[in-house]
Amino acid sequence: MAAARNATPTPQNGRDASRLSFAKITDTLTVPDLLALQTESFDWLVGSDAWKRRVEEGTKQGRTDLALNSGLEEIFEEISPIEDLGETMQLGFTNPYLEEQKYSIDECKERGKTYSAPLYVEAEFMNHLTGEIKTQTVFMGDFPLMTEKGTFIINGTERVVVSQLVRSPGVYFERQQEKTSDKDIYSARVIPSRGAWLEFEIDKRDQVGVRIDRKRKQSVTVFLKALGLTSEQILEEFKGVASIELTLEKDSILTKEEALKDIYRKLRPGEQVAAEAARALLDNFYFNPKRYDLAKVGRYKINRKLGIDKQLTDSVLTVEDILATIKYLVSLHANETKMNGTRDGKPVELRLDVDDIDHFGNRRIRAVGELIQNQVRTGLSRMERVVRERMTTQDIEAITPQTLINVRPVVAAIKEFFGTSQLSQFMDQNNPLAGLTHKRRLSALGPGGLSRERAGVEVRDVHPSHYGRMCPIETPEGPNIGLIGSLASFARINSFGFIETPYRRVVDGVVTDQIDYLTASEEDEFLVAQANAPLTKDFRFAEDRVLVRPKGGEVELVAKENVHYMDVSPRQMVSVATSLIPFLEHDDANRALMGANMQRQAVPLLRSESPLVGTGMEGYAAIDAGDVLTADASGVVAEVSAEVVTIQLDEGGTQTYYLRKFDRSNQGTSYNHRVLVSAGDRIEAGEVIADGPATENGELALGKNLLVAFMPWEGHNFEDAIILSQNLVKDDTLSSIHIEEYEVDARDTKLGKEEITRDLPNVSPELLADLDERGIIRIGAEVRPGDILVGKVTPKGETELSAEERLLRAIFNEKSREVRDTSLKVPHGEQGTIIGVKVFDSQDGDDELGSGVNQRVVVFIAQKRKITEGDKLAGRHGNKGVISKILPVEDMPFLADGTPVDVILNPLGIPGRMNFGQVLETHLGWSAKQGWEVEGKPKWAERLPDHARQAPAGTKVATPVFDGALEEEIAGLLDSTTVTRDGDRLIGSSGKTRLFDGRSGEPFPEPVSVGYMYILKLHHLVDDKIHARSTGPYSMITQQPLGGKAQFGGQRFGEMEVWALEAYGAAYALQELLTIKSDDILGRVKVYEAIVKGENIQEPGIPESFKVLIKEMQSLCLNVEVLSADGQAVSLRDTDDEVFRAAEELGINISTRFESSSIDDI
């Protein structure tokens, strides 16, 4: 994936992807593999070769924190051995391994299967009584595999497992103000990965208390005595600590036995106390590895915090840990600042401090591997219960590992995780960036995380420790703001799950090339300079005092000798999507957030075009997203077609690459590969062979470079509305292809088999014209709403046949059988061209269609959507708007040389929103499009790189985030742009020019800002939103039309709209809306009848909602009656017969569109 990691790509075969960069700082580190977060975690889980190589390299470098066992090995080791209650036999598991996968990725997508491999494990059964050992290899179910792109294919759909941000296990100290007095109350919590919490607290009376498993508080000295310490030992340990001495004085318990019983009483009130049971209870809580697990990370955090040197594999608490926690707590309470401890075998002085729970040193990532591992653990513990049960019930002689093990719980747990977990999500495949960002997402929600309702502002807020780890900008707007983030560009995750970010080591004021990855806790101990701190030629700081970031996030100036580290890149604090926004430094953060989010909604266009003004991240993002085909090895292209590229490899042999043509993505956009190479071309490893959707020459290309003018135009661009030129429609500049998939099953019903056929009852031959002899539509047919895609008939209930009918049936081979037409038709509001048909038949044997399904037909319809009024466009700076008018090209304002502009934007969209990046982008875009040449040595060009002093027309430029082109450089380049044929320079350093009105040819009174801006077409397309209904489904209770396009619903006419009609006195319009157009059941059938027969419409009846109201009032014991004018009670019951009679006469049955029990039709 990350093969193409050369800083300056060499142009080959005319495929030049290099950009002219305005960067002043050279990156010491190239962008890492952006999918490593997913792939490395899964490699560890299954123990792949790549993971083994990484462990080998790490061991050579002397790293001790790496896991030496794969995730699956760990978990089977943890559960082994399973023993029966009498400990007479045991079952152990070793060496889990995966066999070859059953289906390829493409087969899984086509057939709706899961991309997985069978998991096997060696099981060993031992009978202690006879010493007999039986070993077998046992199948543990199919284990879903990750594709190269970091996704899973579950039941044919591509899914992503999002990494979770959770509180790390460890020990935490807190300070809170006591409500009544102003005293500080200190507390400590020991939080394990699994098991009971242990909490200590010093109250306002200076008593030290302990809570076991969140139950009642009790004295800490009782707890210590229960652990085996005597009063003398406690006094010895806490010499001179007043709070402990005070607590001990009030404690009347003397022996360990009494202490255990006292704790048992408080934990299990009302039960008989036995000393043995009391001891077992405490052991099970904190000292039994089956019940309590700190995990390596918890042990690591406790060691670091309390200055203890225990092995990382010690996963349970020890008395030493508990004593150290209490010592730390009482020292905090006594306002001490330092304490002695040991780290890595050396004595150290620890800084005493309370913990910040939102600090990234206390929050860790649970990546894919760990999430699946936890799920397998759940499945295995369920299986463990079954194994124990079977050990006691089966005949000892006949027991084998196979008879004991039931893999169903394990398979079910994995299936449940991938199918229903909050963290296993339907992949966002709108464009390559959407997929890449989805895989790099960090979520604080999900099982074991936070919930939206409980999360306060502090958790959601940006924290200083996020720097270089989680993007402060890219997060959703709405209820999830701050709970879902995105991993920063250079960040990586260490073996404990903490996010690390790279820094350049500074030694005695000299910046070295050594790169250290630091976690948030480690970084707190150092002073870090920013990446753009000026350096001399020998990499020393140019200034005596350097701006640094100490702990706490506030910046300060320090002497250069005191600096420890320096950022590796100016863009290391932002995520991939944010680093694609040029001039981000000139945008308000709220708008940058919208810009980062809206790039993910851009639809791949018919012809992709990479931005004139980029940031240099486009290539990295496109290649790592995996939608661009790159060469695995060097060679020469032997054969090229639209679907296959074959390469003759240098080391011998050939390699074939298959391209995807017009596939449907998860979001219904077109996924299509376009070949970039020709036969005979030389290809190096990592070079681009074919572009995917929304990429050009291996660079991300989400939108189009369009000529924009910032000016008001007849009020048509009021409130962010956008005016476009007809040229963009005519030339298909902003057209996109959308593909929908429809399927139909032929099943076995109680009355017989459904049949896919062309022979449909009461259907005219014109409607069957595009169906083949099987009754399936032909490829290439143009279809409109209501057209038949697949002909299907379903048997009706049969009556007893007479002899004549039976004879007819025998002669005509059952042709006169009673069937109804249940064909698949094009839904309302859809149309397009048939581009593919797939037929699956259960008789072929290899297609497992599910029970009762004989045949399945899948039809793909593609439609080309041109840009139209109502579509949403956006720039990369959060500047979004809806197209209000498409003007003929002759009416558009034009430049002095006659060039009409493409887009007119409202200048009022800029000052209030404070996203000035778009203006700078527009000016630089103009210079890049025209080309430039800098003459002489002007002052503004001093910091320009040498290669940027001249550029031909159409040069693609890069202006990296926080290190891009300066304002004076842009103004200077505008003055240096290439002149037109007439020797004119259309736009000067002001960035403005005189525009002429296309309608009159007169110049506009004021100069207008004109230039090239990169504009995206977003997925909010008007064709998907527009909707109309005449008749359709009604709600069961109220009998009013349903709401929303998906339900084919009506338009809500609410309370305020009723007031408006009342104000106009439009009584008849109002009456119709509230009765016959809504829920007057009898009335609406009669209206239909009257319209069909051409009669006058009758008086409306009583709406159903009025009857519901009366029923509700009667249920409140109010006797409500409706009286006629003469005082007689009126019955509100309709005669159903009347409705049915009218409906039958008209032959209307509109209920076929929605066959649902909760819906009634007219």
From Swiss-Prot:
Gene3D superfamilies reported in the protein's UniProt record: 2.40.50.100, 2.40.50.150, 3.90.1100.10, DNA-directed RNA polymerase, beta subunit, external 1 domain (2.30.150.10), DNA-directed RNA polymerase, subunit 2, domain 6 (2.40.270.10), RNA polymerase alpha subunit dimerisation domain (3.90.1800.10), RNA polymerase Rpb2, domain 2 (3.90.1110.10)
Gene Ontology MF, one: ribonucleoside binding
Record-listed E.C. numbers: 2.7.7.6
UniProt record, GO biological process: DNA-templated transcription
InterPro entries for the chain: DNA-dir_RNA_pol_bsu_ext_1_sf, DNA-dir_RNA_pol_bsu_external_1, DNA-dir_RNA_pol_su2, DNA-dir_RNAP_su2_dom, DNA-dir_RNAP_su2_hyb_sf, RNA_pol_bsu_bac, RNA_pol_bsu_CS, RNA_pol_bsu_protrusion
Cited CDD domains: RNA_pol_B_RPB2
Keyword Transcription attributed: yes
Pfam families: RNA_pol_Rpb2_1, RNA_pol_Rpb2_2, RNA_pol_Rpb2_3, RNA_pol_Rpb2_45, RNA_pol_Rpb2_6, RNA_pol_Rpb2_7
GO cellular component, one term: DNA-directed RNA polymerase complex
UniProt keywords, alphabetically: DNA-directed RNA polymerase, Nucleotidyltransferase, Transcription, Transferase
Reactions accelerated catalytically: RNA(n) + a ribonucleoside 5'-triphosphate = RNA(n+1) + diphosphate
Disulfide bonds, paired cysteine numbers: none
Subunit structure: The RNAP catalytic core consists of 2 alpha, 1 beta, 1 beta' and 1 omega subunit. When a sigma factor is associated with the core the holoenzyme is formed, which can initiate transcription.
HAMAP family recorded: RNApol_bact_RpoB
Function comment: DNA-dependent RNA polymerase catalyzes the transcription of DNA into RNA using the four ribonucleoside triphosphates as substrates.
Annotated family: Belongs to the RNA polymerase beta chain family.
Protein name: DNA-directed RNA polymerase subunit beta
Source organism of the structure: Clavibacter sepedonicus (Clavibacter michiganensis subsp. sepedonicus)
